[in-house]
UniProtKB/Swiss-Prot annotation:
Gene coding for it: rplV
Subunit record text: Part of the 50S ribosomal subunit.
A single Gene Ontology CC term: cytosolic large ribosomal subunit
Keywords recorded for this protein, A-Z: Ribonucleoprotein, Ribosomal protein, RNA-binding, rRNA-binding
Family: Belongs to the universal ribosomal protein uL22 family.
GO annotation terms (biological process): translation
Protein name: Large ribosomal subunit protein uL22
Role: This protein binds specifically to 23S rRNA; its binding is stimulated by other ribosomal proteins, e.g. L4, L17, and L20. It is important during the early stages of 50S assembly. It makes multiple contacts with different domains of the 23S rRNA in the assembled 50S subunit and ribosome.
rRNA processing in keyword set: no
Amino acid sequence: MATEVAARLRGARISAQKARLVADQVRGLEVEKALNLLEFSPKKAAKIVKKVLESAIANAENNDGADVDELKVSTVFVDEGMTMKRIRPRAKGRADRILKRTCHITVKVSEGQE
């Protein structure tokens, strides 16, 4: 009986492209291995994904009474969020547009022997 428990972070201040690099590394791992990998990854997205994963683990433990040692990362996906547009002044009265991208990170953990 594999129940999935999710945690979501909406509007994370990192581009979806960069966050997906980290999300692809932890997909399918046991939570202990995933947390260890994220702890020592130098990427900014690793810290963010780690917090979402810890939240999903806490949700599974407190809401569903799941055994933490049996949990594994069943699903991780990163969707694009809102893009904030900013202006950078340039020479001769011109201006460039800066796109501050955000993303939505979803992590699902399941307890099961799939």
